[in-house]
Curated annotation (Swiss-Prot):
F-type ATPases have 2 components, CF(1) - the catalytic core - and CF(0) - the membrane proton channel. CF(1) has five subunits: alpha(3), beta(3), gamma(1), delta(1), epsilon(1). CF(0) has three main subunits: a, b and c. It comes from Welwitschia mirabilis. PANTHER family: ATP SYNTHASE DELTA/EPSILON CHAIN, ATP SYNTHASE EPSILON CHAIN, CHLOROPLASTIC. Keywords: ATP synthesis, CF(1), Chloroplast, Hydrogen ion transport, Ion transport, Membrane, Plastid, Thylakoid, Transport. This is ATP synthase epsilon chain, chloroplastic. Belongs to the ATPase epsilon chain family. The keyword Membrane applies. One of its GO terms (molecular function) is ATP binding.
Length: 139
């Protein structure tokens, strides 16, 4: 038995096909989702979602949003999403480095919050392609 996963952004459908297992980061922690999971509505964090199809794992970077699980259907409505295989490692590393530089230069509360968010998004993209592990990245 499978789960039907749909990942939607305001502009496109990122994923719409059956999967065997999902590891999803919510605002209250990571959850594993298998077929026949209890119904649930939750906020989704900026994080990497892991997807298993048979024995193969894939990743999708989620930039926050909401998830609804019901009757083996998982619907994710997210602000933005990107498949891990579509991320250019060199560009992702450059974006992360630039975001960290901007965070160090940030002045004022608003600039620091925006810069910190940019670092989190860039770090998440790197994690999706395994360039860096979560424990090897520091702010």
């Amino acid at each position: 038995m499978n789960l039907n996963l749909r990942v939607l952004t305001p502009n496109r459908v990122v994923w719409d096909s059956p999967v065997n297992e999902i590891i999803l980061s919510t605002n209250s922690g990571k959850i594993g989702i298998l077929p026949n999971h209890a119904s649930l509505v939750t906020a989704v964090d900026i994080a990497v979602m892991q997807i298993r199809i048979n024995s193969q794992w894939s990743t999708i970077v989620l930039m926050g949003g909401f998830a609804k699980i019901d009757n083996n259907e998982l619907l994710l409505l997210v602000y933005d999403a990107e498949k891990g295989v579509d991320i250019d490692p060199q560009e992702a590393q450059e974006t992360f480095n630039k975001a960290k530089t901007n965070l160090n230069k940030a002045e004022g509360k608003r600039q620091k919050i925006e810069a910190d968010l940019a670092v989190k998004k860039a770090r998440t993209r790197l994690e999706a392609i395994n360039v860096l592990t979560p424990t090897s990245i520091s702010n």
